[in-house]
């Protein structure tokens, strides 16, 4: 009886310590993101939800990215035209089956303006479908690249979309 009580107390204390630790990490990440945006208000902030990312042919690490709240990579770029390339991933659930979707290396040209925040990610719906679903309350679409992906016998449509926050 006493042994099971110690085990339960041990796991509760362990859970509490881990919970507090992760809350501190999340809080620090959020503060860092806010500080990053305020320190770079004269640049374009770009949230990249992709891997193997290159900007103008250079590795993403050359641009000193930070990790955002959703584990995306965030960079501050001086205004101008950029070629951004990367491999985009997402998942979809169909009939209780999870399908992992991954693009090839996609390259796109974007004109970025100072003081704006952009997000580039893969979505399973078009900008028009999202705008209809959100009753027109969506960010401005800067670029949309439709993809057709065939996984086994399933037909999947996906889009790489760049949104500019309003």
What are these regions (language model features)?
Residues 1-76, 87-166:
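Short loop/turn and low-complexity linker motifs enriched in small/turn-promoting residues
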Residues 80-84:
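A short tyrosine-centered beta-strand micro-motif
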């Amino acid at each position: 009886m006493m042994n099971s009580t110690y085990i339960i107390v041990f796991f509760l204390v362990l859970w509490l310590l881990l919970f507090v630790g992760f809350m501190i990490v999340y809080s620090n990440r959020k503060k860092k993101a806010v500080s990053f945006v305020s320190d770079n208000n004269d640049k374009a902030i770009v949230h990249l939800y992709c891997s193997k990312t290159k900007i103008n042919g250079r590795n993403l690490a050359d641009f000193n990215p930070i990790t955002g709240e959703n584990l995306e990579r965030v960079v501050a770029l001086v205004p101008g035209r950029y070629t951004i390339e990367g491999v985009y991933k997402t998942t979809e659930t169909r009939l209780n089956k999870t399908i992992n979707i991954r693009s090839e290396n996609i390259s796109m040209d974007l004109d970025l303006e100072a003081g704006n925040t952009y997000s580039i990610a893969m979505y399973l719906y078009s900008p028009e479908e999202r705008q209809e679903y959100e009753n027109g309350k969506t960010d401005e679409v800067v670029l949309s690249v439709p993809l057709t992906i065939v996984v086994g016998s399933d037909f999947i449509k996906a889009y790489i979309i760049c949104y500019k926050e309003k």
